[in-house]
UniProtKB/Swiss-Prot annotation:
GO CC, one annotated term: chromosome, telomeric region
PANTHER family per the UniProt record, alphabetical: EP300-INTERACTING INHIBITOR OF DIFFERENTIATION 3, NON-STRUCTURAL MAINTENANCE OF CHROMOSOMES ELEMENT 4
Main localization, broad class: nucleus
Record-given protein name: EP300-interacting inhibitor of differentiation 3
Membrane spanning stretches: none
């Protein structure tokens, strides 16, 4: 059994080694194919350039022969149209050559353009814009479109680098910016390190940097603690006072709410009685002055200037009618009127005919009050305010 296990493990190791070797061979082969593809592409571009140059040369050679009929045999120079055509071809050939050189340069410096913060891509785009001003044929426009596709890919990669490396700090670039800021960028041509320079240069560098940093520090606001520099201690919770202690204290002072409430009710009763007596005196005065003429109930209780005062008058008059000092009845127009009563009649009714009394409820809204004032033309209240 042990021999079989050893043979199995040995077979597995050989299989893994064989798989690794095959994978490595595949990677090497793929890399070689990529190199071959790049070489073939460059060769194709060179062949296209050579073919274009040969075609242009053939056209230039055929040009004078074809125009020999138009020119005189004594004319030693080329026709102006043919000369202009040759100049245009040379210009287009130069533009194509510059486009191919620009594309090749950008492809070679692809990693530097993407991984660094240089303006190489911007400069290449500006150069392409200058070349595009002279483009007049589709072949040059196709090269311009090819360059734009390449530039857009590089811009997309730079954008990804920007999003992923936002927190990355490039100390080399920071040092270069500091040297440019203090005016020591010329030191790169004279010496490689700052330690090799004179002490005066280093001192001036730090003095200028200190001056700029101090100016920024003066603009920053100072930080203040709300509780000061000491550590705030948590205040102890006060014990809750019991309710019975507060009640005992109130009894000792004699300020009892119940007594105050009783005094208030008694005072209100006295006020109501005084107001009822005052209105009764006004009603009796009217009856003495006009003994045979009853007074209109609405004209007596309505106050044309105050709805609330009218309600109070109705309330007080109800006590007068309840106690029998006046009575209310309806006249011929079915309107309520007030009539006086005799004292003897009041005593008799209290003794024997108290069961004949009737009670009624009067409903008066704000609109009803306004209608009564306008209908009865009440301009002045019969019950004057006592205050």
């Amino acid at each position: 059994m042990s021999e079989e296990k050893c043979s199995l493990t040995g077979g597995e190791e050989k299989g893994e080694e064989l798989a690794r070797s095959l994978a490595w061979q595949h990677l090497v082969k793929q890399a070689e194919e990529d190199d071959d593809d790049d070489e073939e592409a460059l060769k194709k571009e060179e062949e296209e350039e050579e073919e274009e140059e040969e075609e242009d040369e053939e056209e230039e050679e055929e040009g004078p022969d074809s125009s020999s009929d138009d020119l005189s045999p004594e004319a030693p120079c080329m026709h102006p149209d043919l000369l202009e055509l040759a100049v245009d071809r040379e210009k287009c050939r130069s533009i194509r050559r510059q486009y191919r050189q620009l594309i090749y340069t950008v492809q070679q410096n692809r990693e530097d353009i993407v991984n660094t913060a240089s303006d190489s891509l911007t400069e290449a785009l500006e150069e392409a814009n200058v070349l595009f001003d002279g483009v007049s044929r589709t072949r040059e426009a196709a090269l311009d479109a090819q360059f734009l596709v390449l530039a857009s890919d590089l811009g997309k990669e730079k954008a990804k680098q920007l999003n992923s490396d936002m927190s990355f700090f490039n100390h080399v670039a920071f040092c270069e910016l500091l040297l440019v800021f203090v005016g020591l960028n010329w030191m790169e041509e004279e010496c490689e390190e700052l330690s090799e320079c004179d002490e005066s240069i280093a001192l001036s560098f730090w003095n200028m940097l200190h001056k700029e940093a101090t100016a920024w520090m003066l603009q920053a606001e100072t930080f203040h603690f709300i509780f000061g520099s000491f550590k705030a201690e948590r205040s102890a919770r006060k014990p809750r006072q019991e309710h019975h202690k507060r009640a005992c204290k109130m009894e000792g002072n004699g300020d009892m709410p119940t007594k105050l409430r009783k005094l208030d009710v008694h005072a209100n009763q006295e006020t109501t009685e005084k107001e009822v007596e005052r209105i009764l005196g006004l009603l009796q005065t009217y009856f003495q002055k006009y003994p045979d003429t009853p007074v209109s109930y609405f004209e007596f209780v309505i106050d044309p200037n105050s709805f609330s005062r009218t309600v109070e008058n109705i309330f007080y008059v109800s006590f007068i009618i309840r106690d029998g000092f006046a009575r209310i009845r309806l006249d011929q127009d079915r309107l309520p009127i007030l009539e006086p009563t005799n004292v003897n009649q009041v005593d008799e009714e209290n003794d024997s005919c108290s069961y004949c009394r009737k009670q009624g409820v009067i409903s008066l809204s704000l609109q009803d009050w306004k209608n009564i004032v306008s209908t009865f033309e009440i301009s002045e209240a019969m019950i004057k305010n006592s205050y």
